[in-house]
């Protein structure tokens, strides 16, 4: 019994802490105090570095170096925690690579346009992996010459992949996904992810089915705050919004401290509040990572790393479609246009054995009690 108590204390204090994130159908539903907190994005302080250039020293510049290191632009790991405020060659090279990736004027100077891009909320996945950027390179797929005209045309693709081009194996085309039960998500929130999966399902031979058993699903989805066990801690509202891992890992984590809009009305466009993030827009992007896509330098594409607050972007572009079809092929029923998303597909394989039962309406406390009950019960059976 003592061993069980010790184990429970360990779980309570050291296990990743899921959070009950804030979900709102529209801006008027967001409490005013949360809107005020959301506007205090610490990244906005980077705007004070406008005009900074190599050879100078600026107070607080070390924080911008930490930003660039997090997203892969600075690879010198021995400098972690020891960055200076000097605008050195390391930072200049990082700025130049960032400007190339986002198709900005490459100067190595922290001009206004560059810094305005830097402070936009974004995906937590890096743009540069092991010192190599795939965002700006593109791939020339074909070239056509016209005799007598001296003209050449070529098509360039901007989609990218994780190193090694990982993908789900051919024998796993019906992928399952589940939500961390400790988040106690409602059906309204879960339906947002269903719509997001459908957008990728329509253009590939893959299918996505919601199940209840979180521990055995191909894709696991959860909302967390701060450090949550994967070495990629979240950093508060309006900075890194979410991250997802390459196949076949299947982990999809979202920042539980954001104000999430779940209305899901219409296609691309703007939502009515600038201090909130459209959940479906972020979900569609992160599912692209789950399938093996990296970031794209095409600003209108789903796989572009940033999304402006108040923006809704959910429609796959040609770049997104061609990238995922390179990995998996096309859906034989796809004709180049989207149809309205079908109703949510769900196959209940939960431990409860109750067909069709959903945990979406249960409280956070109920889910936590059930979660720890099964841990204690399992340990009891093991020890006796």
From Swiss-Prot:
Residues 1-21 form the signal peptide. Residues 22-158, 359-384 form a propeptide. Glycans are attached at residues 26, 37, 48, 78, 82, 105, 130, 335. Its cofactor is Zn(2+). Mostly expressed in leaves and roots, and, to a lower extent, in flowers and stems. It is a lipid-anchor; GPI-anchor. A lipid is attached at residue 358 (GPI-anchor amidated serine). Optimum temperature is 35 degrees Celsius. Gene3D superfamilies: Collagenase (Catalytic Domain). This is Metalloendoproteinase 3-MMP. GO terms for cellular component: extracellular matrix; plasma membrane; side of membrane. PROSITE patterns: CYSTEINE_SWITCH (PS00546), ZINC_PROTEASE (PS00142). The keyword Cell cycle does not apply. Zn(2+) binds at residues 123, 285, 289, 295. It comes from Arabidopsis thaliana (Mouse-ear cress). Keywords: Cell membrane, Glycoprotein, GPI-anchor, Hydrolase, Lipoprotein, Membrane, Metal-binding, Metalloprotease, Protease, Signal, Zinc, Zymogen. Matrix metalloproteinases (MMPs) or matrixins may play a role in the degradation and remodeling of the extracellular matrix (ECM) during development or in response to stresses. Active on McaPLGLDpaAR-NH(2) (QF24) and beta-casein and, to some extent, on myelin basic protein (MBP). The lineage of its organism: Eukaryota, Viridiplantae, Streptophyta, Embryophyta, Tracheophyta. Residues 330-360 are annotated as: Disordered. It comes from the Eukaryota.
